[in-house]
Amino acid sequence: MIHTTRLLWFAAGFTVSQRLILLHPAHANDTALLAHERTHQEQMARVGTLTFWWRYLTDKAFRQQAEVEAYKVQIAHGANRDTCAGWLAGNYWLGIDFATAYALLQD
């Protein structure tokens, strides 16, 4: 894991590969965010890193599934569901509104 401020304007963390997570220093102790990013590492381990990134960037349904899984883990580690739904609805080019994102994040 590397702590860096060189992330996209909306990102607190970013999983590059199965072995590399970038976290903004302001979130260095955010265990819920780290659990979210580790979920992406597990997803990469399941399908392969290159396959993960190809599908994540080209397949909206795959991207949504990957983020919903990761946000559910983040919520289970104490993150606020409203906050996570806002991020899910607004930052992944999924074409969903807050209510839809919130519903996707319910158990």
Write out the residue ranges for each language-model feature.
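Post-HEXXH active-site segment of zinc metalloproteases
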Residues: 6-22, 27-32, 43-74, 82-88
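Histidine-centered divalent metal-coordination motifs
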Residues: 36, 40
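Juxtamembrane/interface helices at transmembrane-helix boundaries
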Residues: 1-5
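Long, well-structured alpha-helical subdomains associated
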Residues: 78-107
